[in-house]
């Protein structure tokens, strides 16, 4: 972190601080801005931004208060949904995409229950050997002695393989799932990139809808399986979802993004963190039993989803500030996970941190991430297999991050492997 960025963060008038700027996360310069908000204004109002006026909630305690109160704070697309950027305005006849994450109760619970069995503990126990088999296959085929991009060869590859399994999607076309996941948040207000071809984005998302519609139709009349499409078809609340293009595309994209981003960017973030803190890396070499706790700490430290947005359904006092009905409230999970009042030495990755699981990366309350156990399982298995084969996954160049204020994505992690 440059001293210049810290000076800038301390000199800007409090009322003008805008932590939604995508370049803060691309350049990894967000820390001093959130440090200041947590200290001076954990509930902070910005009157004007690219995303309109909004409240920022930056402390761990107040984030949980908002996330846990779904009667006051709405996730519904009717009120603007879950991201600080309002959804793109659909053209005439265009599909917008709506999923259960952008619904309030009871609709949210009804549709969430349809796919929950896919990631239930009993089913995860059944697919654990498959995850391990695929992790081993990936690791055994990595180049040794030369540098390569860990994101492309490991993070993306493992999540693409698991996504194909979860959807029973054609395995040879698995990288389409990753591409469609990236498209889901590729809008200028989220990325800061005004050159995005929104027509091509829409056309490509329609290809995703078409591919999944064909997959849906191919499963009609087939024995029920534990893949996500079969689960949707065999639940009363979602059995006819294919007849509603908005809900169909929205639900598919939610499940793709949910199955991709947390795992993929935590796999990448873990390598970065362990290289930054080599003493912590040594701890898991000495005691691999720390890996499950390390996984929680990586997810805290990386925080794959930077924020979630809610909209106030009524006037509400939060942290001494008066929020009015209809106002946008943004929970900055990334900041909550660096709250020193909860996590001692919060900016450091500490693999045996006793309260690592207190992180808010998966959210809190009824919208808590449904696939959190699957993400943790994949990370645990991968690091168990890494430590059996490699003394070090060494970072050998500069990390490249994506410009995005919603997903804390990583594009390039150049590494070299050092076998045991």
Protein language model features and the residues they cover:
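Cytochrome P450
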Residues: 1-420
